[in-house]
Amino acid sequence: IYEKDYLKTALDAIHKAKHPLIFCSDYFEVRDGKRVTSNKLLQIKRIMLLPMRIKAFQSVRWVRRRILSMGSPICCPSVTFVTENLPKVVFENHYRACEDWEAWEKLSKKKGEFLYSTKLLMGHRIHEESETTAAIGDNKRSREEYEMFCKFWPKFIAKFIFKFYSKGQNSNQL
């Protein structure tokens, strides 16, 4: 569910940027038809994205990769792609629950900017039929998340971070 200012905010940011790769915004959850603007998971994601509030950091690969090394705070439906600055294939499609995180990891290596707005510009529906919920149910999400952490960290550190990160899976329950 996109707010009326989403497109204007995205286009304004993209037009002001030197070499934008993606634009993303903060978001709210929609649970049982109700707008949820704050919960533990949203607060953690907002903290993770704090460095992206600083425009100078939006183009720094090291900063983007450090953020992503701790998890995936970018809500996929909030993303607008600047396709002329991206590879033809953004999503590899070999992950079921982490294909967006894998895409951000790949794009984070590229020269350009990850533009971020702190405005709540879209609502993400949380429901029991989602692919995320299904992937949690069959443990596929856990395996994929651990693999993603291993792209940034040695296995023993990835395992340690994953123990804390996996607690966020509970937030997908209604």
Q: Can you describe what each PLM-predicted range is?
A:
Residues 3, 32, 131-133:
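Conserved protein kinase catalytic core
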Residues 5-44:
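Conserved donor NDP-sugar-binding/catalytic core segment of glycosyltransferases
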Residues 16-17, 110, 151-152:
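Alpha-helix C-cap/termination motif
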Residues 25, 43-141:
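Conserved nucleotide-sugar donor-binding catalytic segment
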Residues 32-35, 126, 168-173:
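Short, solvent-exposed polar/charged micro-motifs at secondary-structure junctions
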Residues 50-62, 113-114, 137-174:
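C-terminal, non-catalytic tails of nucleotide-sugar-dependent glycosyltransferases
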